[in-house]
Design a protein with these regions (language model features):
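Thiamine diphosphate
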Residues: 1-135
């Protein structure tokens, strides 16, 4: 069997893996993770199946907090679930992250690490967003 190689950026690589390994994907666009959600939505629209032969349900929410709430609800219903976020969006998910961890419910949160803007918009990469929520479990 001949290997097939493709060149993709980090967002597309994450979207491909997330789409193949989840049943529900809750999204809300925030730079630089927007492309992950857009690609996952595109894959489901095209009818691409995950590893279990099911087309994942992609739900665009009204906010990052809504996306985190949708993840929590889907996890409680027994679905393999994920979302994509970064920066201030991740900070808005912190209350739900505590709830999810406190209920010992595992899931994978895909974070495109970005500076948390303190006084003006910042698109620079660092880990201040991830470090702000590392204690959530």
């Amino acid at each position: 069997m001949r290997e097939r190689w493709i060149t993709v950026d980090g967002n597309e690589a994450v979207a491909r893996v997330a789409h193949r390994t989840n049943e529900v994907i809750a999204i809300y666009p925030i730079t630089p993770s927007s492309a992950m959600g857009e690609l996952a939505d595109e894959y489901s629209t095209q009818g691409r199946q995950n590893l279990w032969g099911v087309v994942p349900t992609v739900v665009e929410m009204q906010s990052e907090g809504g996306a985190a709430g949708a993840v929590h609800g889907a996890l409680q219903a027994g679905s393999l679930t994920t979302t994509f976020t970064s920066s201030q969006g991740l900070l808005l998910m912190i209350p739900n992250l505590y709830k999810i961890a406190g209920e010992l419910t595992p899931f994978c949160l895909h974070v495109a690490a970005r500076t948390v803007a303190t006084h003006a918009l910042s698109i620079f990469g660092d880990h201040s967003d991830v470090m702000a929520c590392r204690q959530t479990g």
